[in-house]
Amino acid sequence: MGKKRIVFFACLLLFTVLLRFSYAGITTESPLSVEQTLSSSNGIYELGFFSPNNSQNLYVGIWFKGIIPRVVVWVANRETPTTDTSANLAISSNGSLLLFNGKHGVVWSIGENFASNGSRAELTDNGNLVVIDNASGRTLWESFEHFGDTMLPFSSLMYNLATGEKRVLTSWKTDTDPSPGVFVGQITPQVPSQVLIMRGSTRYYRTGPWAKTRFTGIPLMDDTYASPFSLQQDANGSGFFTYFDRSFKLSRIIISSEGSMKRFRHNGTDWELSYMAPANSCDIYGVCGPFGLCIVSVPLKCKCLKGFVPHSTEEWKRGNWTGGCARLTELHCQGNSTGKDVNIFHPVTNVKLPDFYEYESSVDAEECHQSCLHNCSCLAFAYIHGIGCLIWNQNLMDAVQFSAGGEILSIRLAHSELGGNKRNKIIVASTVSLSLFVILTSAAFGFWRYRVKHKAYTLKDAWRNDLKSKEVPGLEFFEMNTIQTATNNFSLSNKLGQGGFGSVYKGKLQDGKEIAVKQLSSSSGQGKEEFMNEIVLISKLQHRNLVRVLGCCIEGEEKLLIYEFMLNKSLDTFVFDARKKLEVDWPKRFDIVQGIARGLLYLHRDSRLKVIHRDLKVSNILLDEKMNPKISDFGLARMYEGTQCQDKTRRVVGTLGYMSPEYAWTGVFSEKSDIYSFGVLLLEIIIGEKISRFSYGEEGKTLLAYAWESWGETKGIDLLDQDLADSCRPLEVGRCVQIGLLCVQHQPADRPNTLELLAMLTTTSDLPSPKQPTFVVHSRDDESSLSKDLFTVNEMTQSMILGR
């Protein structure tokens, strides 16, 4: 009897422990009490009640499970704590999530009611508390849209100017008081955006504008920086700044009660501080005032920009620099064409760019300079890699000079600042000489215009004759004015993206037909042979998974290809986008993968001549209105007849990361070269990361190395982007990972051919075990290219080829 009693109490204790630590979900019938917690399925996060610093106040929060001391990452009722130990968190009858106080009713709620037949609250594996509709599975509310002081991986700061919605970080009042503090972290609606910390209504710290993968005001974020961030801004006035960190299982970004933005990563034992800002006195906003330059040193040093002097010498002597500087010589600006009053620009290097910049779109560096020069309100400009042209029409505020890194800021000065007040030399020319010069110049210009126009017509006729000799049926020749009208003169609003050899624009012909226009840039390296190759090849290849060319336009040196318009653009706009990736769930991705394989099979086997694409990658897969994939960009493709199965070139073309070892190293390409590229593409689609940007762990594992390691540990099932976990079929995902690894094996003979590849994707037959890939390339640049003696990127020498 005694033993039975012991067993009974042991079972009761176990039940209590399981109830305490393994609560499954919150529903109307199953509220969460003070003694219970709700865990994420991966065991990383936990939701429950806590009391900071052993106070009497009770808060509902999320923290890292099993980490001591406890690190709270989100608080529900941060402004309304309760002291009632009978409080509980529950789903109301109208589907809302409420915190009930046993004595005083509702203490906190999500503030929304839903027309729902039932809902539940769950804690996801990325620490997001979600309220889900039971019937549809739709997310009704999520904590990631209602920040506290912490960002977790896959969460986003955002703004929407149309709706006024913002997601910001708000500090705790103190380290032990979760109520809102005075510091707020947000992204600004400028283009490009920057992260800004406000102290009440005053600017406290800013990162500088975002430049593709880095913040320009953080010198540690150089071109080699593996950025865990992503910024998307659109023309409708909204922006999303998303935090990714795949290199560490546990990581977070917080805004502390003292106003510091900190990034922590857990090494398995302790939290490591990997970044903190403000990091020095110069990081404090506007410490040197307008037109002042803060020099990063100990102690802090302020100086005025060239051409400026302290606004108040006495204040500067006392160490109060916030009054800033005033211009020494006033500007005289009347178009800045000629004359002694012409303004000049003085470059300042290693600078954190000032605040209140404005973005000038679609201009190069020289046009940026001229735009500022001819705008009398423009005080400075900068042309930044990854951004383009920025100009300043307001006081230059919060400029910092680093010992290394930073950007070049060109500030506007009076011409006299260049070399003192020396008198300018005056060049006097006689009226007769000037008149003669004008006459000769006009005559020369007229003759040049005639030669250019004549050459343009001659070139156009030569191109037409060459294409006609290739017997390209159904190929239409478009006039330039037709394409200019269709694309609104190649306006920026019509630009769809950047292709392998130039820009791509959306157009609409007079009959209402939508087209895509590929404008080949003069610097692309694609000459007549490559252009002819792409026209002839695509026009003769017909398959539902290949893009269709409608015609071309040749006007002088201008070469345009006109394609059928793909409504959903390219696959990379979905797979690598933090928001749009959710529109392409796993079943749809698997369909896309099979479609690409079918298109590749046609190129390799089913057309009369074998076609090797040589530049197969995610950005070259276009999607129609039904999300059907179509392989595009055939400028680098090669064809050969009969039994020939490989070729060799001295000029290797393609994109770094997608190129097979034998092709990149020796110039040998074959069907197996495209198979290698397909394997990389398949793994990118599964993981949701670009190979050129992927880096995992302290060793900086490449995407292929990471996939190989994952396949060895879990057969690759954990590789799928976690945001797609609900839609995945684990065995199918694991099989695709194995197929991807089979495709990227070092030896071409070990890789499947295209027929075998499609069979692997469409059947459940046994697969061989892959061998470890050895050719792994690590690059920080998007779609970087090789350029060595053996390699020439986006250039090629090839013979004219004919398709079927």
From Swiss-Prot:
Keywords: ATP-binding, Cell membrane, Disulfide bond, EGF-like domain, Glycoprotein, Kinase, Lectin, Membrane, Nucleotide-binding, Phosphoprotein, Receptor, Serine/threonine-protein kinase, Signal, Transferase, Transmembrane, Transmembrane helix. CDD domains: B_lectin (cd00028), PAN_AP_plant (cd01098), STKc_IRAK (cd14066). The modification Phosphoserine is found at residues 524, 539, 619, 632, 692. Residues 490-775 form the Protein kinase domain. The modification Phosphothreonine is found at residue 649. This is G-type lectin S-receptor-like serine/threonine-protein kinase At1g61490. The active site is at residue 615. One of its GO terms (cellular component) is plasma membrane. It catalyses: L-seryl-[protein] + ATP = O-phospho-L-seryl-[protein] + ADP + H(+); L-threonyl-[protein] + ATP = O-phospho-L-threonyl-[protein] + ADP + H(+). SUPFAM superfamilies: alpha-D-mannose-specific plant lectins, Protein kinase-like (PK-like). GO terms for biological process: recognition of pollen. Residues 25-425 are extracellular. It is a single-pass type I membrane protein. ATP binds at residues 496-504, 518. Residues 447-804 are cytoplasmic. Glycans are attached at residues 53, 94, 117, 134, 236, 267, 320, 336, 375. It is found in: Cell membrane. It comes from the Eukaryota. Pfam families: B_lectin, DUF3403, PAN_2, PK_Tyr_Ser-Thr, S_locus_glycop.
